[in-house]
Each structure stands twice: as C-alpha cells, then as structure tokens.
C-alpha cells in the first residue's frame, strides 16, 4: 500500500513537471514569436543606371558620351577601430589614391559626428576603380573582416565596404567644338535608382533628348550570399539595362574644327560680336559644318547665358542686301521684269520720302542682272514698285521666310515678315533691299540653297541616323523636299549670283576651278531708339560647286568693330573665301582643271 502511494505521488509530480515544462515552452515561444528578432537581412536590391547615348560625327569621332561615376562608403559600425589603418592601406592599394587623399579621409573621419555612421570614403570613382574596390569588398567580407551590427530597424547586418553608382557623367571630348549647336545637359535624380542622370537642355542634346535618354535601368533583386552577392535563381528578379540611342551626325569633326579655327583667326582682326558659318550639302540638306566664334565648354559653362544660345536659329535680324535675290526672283517669276530689260537707276541717287538713297555704283541705267551684280538699292526700289503688297510678301513666304526652317534644333525662331495689308509704299521699297523684316541665318542658308538645288527647298539637317537595339534608323523621313521654283528660274538666279562673284561685288571670293556665286549684305542694327550709325551686320550667302559636288555656304558677321569692316565685302566675303579654300583642302571640293566651267546642279 505504501509502495502504491509512492508511485502515485511520483506520477503526479512527473505530470506536474511536464505540464510546467510545456507551459514554459509555450510562453517562451509566444514571446519569441511576438518580439523583435535580430535576424540577418538576407535580401538585396541592386541598380545600375542605363546611360545616355553618345553623339558621333560623320567621320566617326565620338564627341559626346556618358560614363558611370561611383562613390565608396562604409558603415563605421562594421569595422573595429584597431583594423581601420589596415583597411585604409588596402583601400589605397586597390583604388590607387594618393597619401594626401588617405590623410584627408582620416581627417574627415575625426570630424565625423558621433551618431553619423555612414561615411563616404571617396567620390568620383570611375568604372575601373569601382571594379577593383568591389573585388576588395568581396574578399574582406568573405574573410570576416567586417563585423555584424544591429541596425535601427532591429535587423542584424554586415554592411562593410559599399561601392555605389551615384552619378552619370556627361563628357564632351571635343571641348568647345560644335557649340553652341551640340548644347548641354543638366542632372536630375532618377526616382527609381536614386542615381543622378542627365537630361538635355539646349541644342542637339535637347532636340534628341527622347532618343538619347536611357530606356530602362538594370535591376537585380533577390537573396544574397555570405559575400553580399545576389543569388541568381528562379526567384530572383533581373531587368536588363537598355541605354539611349547613339546619334550619328552629318557634321564632320575635321571640317568643323578647320572652320572654327579660321573663324577665330578672322575674328582676331574683325573683333566682331560673333561670326557664324554654315556649310550645307545642296542636294540633301545635310549640314556638314555649323560653326560660331561664340563657343563654350559644356562641362564648364560660364555666367554669360547668351553664349549658350544657337544664334544661327535664335537670332533674328534685318539682313540687308542678301534679301534682294528673293524679291528679284519673285518679280521674274511673276513676269514683272525681263532679264534683257534695262532699268533707270537715276545716276546712283534717288529720293525716297525724306531720305536720299545712294548706290555705291553710280549708273544712270542698269540691266536687271546688274541690279544684283552691283547690289543697287535704287534698282530694287524700281522692281518693288511693279509688285503689289501681296505679291512681294507672298514671294518671301514661298522661300519660307516667316516660318521655321525645320532644322533639328530646339528654340528656332521663325522671324518676322510684314503684314501686306499694312505695308506702305516706303516700307515696300526698303523691304526690297532687306529692311523691315527679320530673318535668321538658317532661314537664309536654306533659302539660298534653292538656287543651287534646281528650285527645290529642302529641310536642313544636322543628324543623319541613330543606332539602338542593334540596328540603324535613318532620319530622312523628317526631311521635307519641295519644288518651290522652276528649274529655269533657279538656273537664271544661279548664273546671276555667279556673276556677282566673277564681275561684281564678290570678286574677292573668286577661286580658280570652282563655280561660286552669292550675294553680300550689309545692314544697320536696329535698336529701340532706331538704327545706329556704327553697328552693322555683314552677310554673305552663296554656293561653291565642282563637277560632282555642290555646297551652299552662309557667313554672318555680327557687329564687327574694326573700322570699315562692317562692309560685307571686307568681312563676310573673305570668310566665305576661307571656307571654300578649306573645302578644297579637306577634299570636299576638287577644282575643275579646264576653263569650261559649267554649273553642276542640273
């Protein structure tokens, strides 16, 4: 009986102990499940910013591209202080930094706030440095160099050395060349990756921003291994990087640089506010060079914001006598004048309202061809009298004055032409020799091209094609070609302009073996108070051909300050001759060997 009682007590005690044990386990489990657990963070996201596309010249020089910029940082909680000197020594070896840079890191670390753990070791690392440092970080991680710590979220992690892509650097290898037309970019924060990327602000960078901009960033998401690398398996997310397009230009680097050099040399003498030169392939509208003396480094822009503007399309001005051929052509096309006709030029002096108009070549009479050859304002007034207001303004509209040329640049101005309903006789007279309207350099270049392109107006084009996803796409679909002048009228005007150089005001541009024609223009600059007596713009627009090639060339010299250089024959015309010589030297033109020079644009 006594034995039975002992067994029963033992069983009850055992049952009680087991119940107590289960209760302890239950309570402990509940506490463990409901409390914060310091579990190592095993997930990782990794981004790589897709890059903006490159810009490449006709002669296959990359003039603009992008690169990735990285920074190296460390969480100070991941490293023991007694190991930091060793770490810095390894960091210096792998990054290639100097002793001074190491000293700077130590100094900044001493000044680091106590509760600020994230420390940037080095910024502006290139891809090569970043690759070496990533290798170092991996080795140190595997060897247990870094210690684990509990972060603010209660998770245990070992951050160690992190190499982070933080910026896309836009590089302009050609420095100030091709500016201002190439434009520039500014940096904004990419919301997905948190990396600074570039967007176009001016020039080609702006116009083709959608094409040049990256399509898709690289993204890898998944579990990480002991070395901090993402484990690639069926559960990981991988998004491919798609960079922006590479833009191929019609512009030639060699030709552009040669013309820019010639412009700079001329402007040392002329002291002009700006010199602009454009060269267009007449039959295709391709711009082979578009140069300015007002250039800048896109990576180090100054405070003068006006330099950033592309004056070739954004500066509207009264062009003077270079407008005469278009009024002349309008009268010829409408049958208001005949080429064999002689017109009264009043001995080179003519009363227009309260003003007296004088010609440089004082003649009682001139043939129609001589009116252009000698740039007679009086002759043009007589021609304008035969046109009514609608005819003269419509004639300008045919050549696309008053509308954008369509060139692939942003912020193009369309200029101003007068309202025919409000055009008085005196205003119509001065319009005939280039006052009372505003035009741009590019409008004039495209309009003069008609005379050298069998009467066809064609859209000027800086870019030829772009490359993306393994294939080229031509941009020819954006080029408009329109017959606006009969072949006969275009041929007549071409010959008239050839005579300007061979027999008239453009003799300084004569080049042996080259068929060249064009027109000078000198115009006072209008200000709020009226026309100034000492500020002028000088222009020359024309063409230069050989047996197989035809180019339309424009020169604008804005406000030259050298005495008497405001005359186009003393400033713009010699610059035109420089360009023709460059085209020959660079083998764009080949002088004709025999003396039977005939036009090549039939």
Task: Describe each PLM feature range.
Residues 1-300, 390-400, 509-512, 528-531, ...:
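Periplasmic/cell-envelope proteins involved in peptidoglycan metabolism and beta-lactam response
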Residues 62-64, 224-238, 275-321, 326-561, ...:
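Beta-lactam-recognizing serine transpeptidase/beta-lactamase-like catalytic domain environment
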